[in-house]
């Protein structure tokens, strides 16, 4: 493995370990960012199941024209995952940025999720 991959893996593990310590039974809002799309899911680690998910690949996103890996798509994904989580009765989550900097698309997704009813 390259030094950069090892560094990124260590950062991801460090962030997730810190989250598990402070979660107190709350589900986590996990973000994955690729060069073409953005994905988010609300995961209950105690049960090991996904409660809600959304991505820029979904048909509703394509119809609205919010596809791809830009800030507008991240905002739409954040809003959609928050609405789905609130429908399932989840209002409190822990934000798992997954080793990504809290900036740009990750920040836009988090802000949109907060505006749509999730608190973290």
From Swiss-Prot:
Key word Ribosomal protein present: yes
Leader peptide range in chain numbering: none
Entry keywords, A to Z: Ribonucleoprotein, Ribosomal protein, RNA-binding, rRNA-binding
GO biological process terms held by the UniProt record: translation
Keyword match rRNA-binding: yes
Domain of life from the UniProt record: Bacteria
Pfam families per the UniProt record, alphabetical: Ribosomal_L18p
GO cellular component: cytosolic large ribosomal subunit
Single GO MF annotation: structural constituent of ribosome
Subunit structure: Part of the 50S ribosomal subunit; part of the 5S rRNA/L5/L18/L25 subcomplex. Contacts the 5S and 23S rRNAs.
PANTHER family cross-referenced by the UniProt entry: 39S RIBOSOMAL PROTEIN L18, MITOCHONDRIAL, LARGE RIBOSOMAL SUBUNIT PROTEIN UL18M
Job of this protein: This is one of the proteins that bind and probably mediate the attachment of the 5S RNA into the large ribosomal subunit, where it forms part of the central protuberance.
Record-stated family: Belongs to the universal ribosomal protein uL18 family.
NCBIfam families: L18_bact
Name the record gives this protein: Large ribosomal subunit protein uL18
Naturally occurring in which organism (per UniProt): Rhodopseudomonas palustris (strain ATCC BAA-98 / CGA009)
Gene: rplR
